[in-house]
Structure formats: structure tokens, C-alpha cells
Design a protein with these regions (language model features):
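Glycine-rich phosphate/dinucleotide-binding loop and adjoining beta-alpha-beta core of small-molecule
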Residues: 1-46, 118-126
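Short, small-residue alpha-helix embedded
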Residues: 53-84
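Active-site proximal loops enriched in glycine and acidic residues that flank catalytic Cys/His/Asp
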Residues: 28-30, 37, 45-46, 55-57, ...
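Glycine-rich phosphate/pyrophosphate-binding beta-alpha loops
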Residues: 49-51
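Short, well-structured alpha-helical segments that form the helix of a local strand-helix-strand
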Residues: 11-20, 74-87, 102-110
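Short acidic (Asp/Glu) and glycine-rich catalytic loops that position anionic groups and cofactors
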Residues: 43-45, 61, 85-89
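Charged C-terminal helix
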Residues: 87-126
Length: 126
């Protein structure tokens, strides 16, 4: 309701201010991840409570790093990394329930790509 919208607006505003102040992209994890470069923002609602375990933030960082290495600009890379990691976590939860390990999320990353980008081939290092 209205309270949720008000709280989200405050949260987004605070994160955007911090991003501008630091001159960097920020991803604030939560039920809805907030991703911003200070000028624009996205909310990502993928993922589930089973992902609140050690190592999933490391997985998220690695996926974002992969998108950065593929020459995506930082805001887009962070949005894509958040989405893919969240979808992978949702797929893992369908298979295993909410008692997940970070490796369950990792194992589901190829399926997350296949679901939204069928036939996608990962860029290989040159």
C-alpha cells in the first residue's frame, strides 16, 4: 500500500544520493534490489529468501563482473547481473526449496540465461 511506496521512495532517494556522492553504481540488496548510478534507477524483484545465505553476494558480484567484462556499461551490467542472479536463485528454489547454498544459485545460472536468452553463447576471452 501507501506505506510501502513511501518507504521505497525514501530508500531509492537515499541510495541515489549516495551514488551521486560516490560517483559509482550502487546495488542495495533487499526484497527489491535498488540499482542506481545516481541519475537513473531500477528495482529488481527477482530472488527469494533462500538466497540470504553466505556466498550469494559473491555470486552476484561475479555475475556483475562477467557482464562488465563483456563491455556493458556499469549500470546496465549491474542491472543484468542482479536479474540473472535473482532468476538463478528462483530456479534453484524451485528445485531445492528455500534451503539454498550459493553453489545451487551458481548451478542455475545457465538455466537463467536459457530461460530469457535461448541459444545465447557466452563471449569467450580473446
Amino acid at each position: 500500500g501507501a506505506d510501502f511506496e513511501r518507504l521505497m521512495a525514501v530508500r531509492v532517494n537515499d541510495v541515489m544520493k549516495a551514488s551521486l556522492r560516490l560517483g559509482s553504481v550502487i546495488l542495495l540488496k533487499g526484497k527489491y534490489d535498488v540499482i542506481t548510478d545516481g541519475k537513473r534507477y531500477k528495482l529488481d524483484g527477482t530472488g527469494n529468501p533462500g538466497m540470504a545465505v553466505g556466498g550469494v553476494g559473491d555470486v552476484l558480484s561475479g555475475v556483475i563482473g562477467a557482464f562488465l567484462s563483456w563491455k556493458n556499461e556499469p549500470f546496465r551490467a549491474t542491472c543484468a547481473g542482479s536479474f540473472v542472479t535473482g532468476v538463478a536463485g528462483d530456479i534453484a528454489a524451485l528445485r531445492k526449496g528455500y534451503h539454498l547454498l550459493a553453489t545451487d544459485v551458481i548451478d542455475s545460472i545457465p538455466d537463467a540465461f536459457s530461460k530469457y536468452w535461448p541459444g545465447y553463447r557466452f563471449p569467450l576471452p580473446s
